[in-house]
Amino acid sequence: MKFSLVDDVDRMFDSQAKAWPLLARGLQGLRESQTRVERAFGRDVLVRHIPHRIKSTTAAVDVASIAQRKCFLCPANLDPVEEGIPFDSEFTAYCNPFPILDRHLTIIHADHRPQRISGQFGAFLKLAQALPDSFIIYNGPECGASAPDHLHFQSCSRAVFPIGHDILHDGYIPRVFKLEGGNPDELVHRMEQL
């Protein structure tokens, strides 16, 4: 049985934008961002300048810096007004207060554990099914994740950023893997092989 989070996510964003000043400022920053399309290597590339993202994109993620800070994804350290939507018994989806696109979520594992995808493809796939109008991101610990010490995924609306479009063209060397199929167990098995 498919389970959709779409309506719950929309309600959460509406509610949290009113109750949580940090998210309200982040959404305002997103509305004020500058976006244009540039042509590069025969492809259209979406370029977006989002000044409010500087805190996240410049976060210190070295071992010493991480050891000196509280994990901002652990439930005990979340903003008291921050609310989430439980997902699949081990995760909770929260509004990302530093959004890059519409409906930007951070989906956080209940336990403080390292950012590792191994063994998590089933949850990743369930998220993709529950958020069909979004794309799901796993950002590795050495690939830009600002919280390499706590397992999490992110999701954003596909509306502005059709991530799957260019990977379908011949001659394009993908930095994204796109797997499709009707058998979830087979998809999880294939993902574990990557």
Please place each PLM-identified region on the residue numbering.
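Histidine-centered nuclease catalytic patch
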Residues: 149
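Active-site microenvironments that recognize anionic phosphate/pyrophosphate groups
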Residues: 1-124, 134-146, 158-179, 184-194
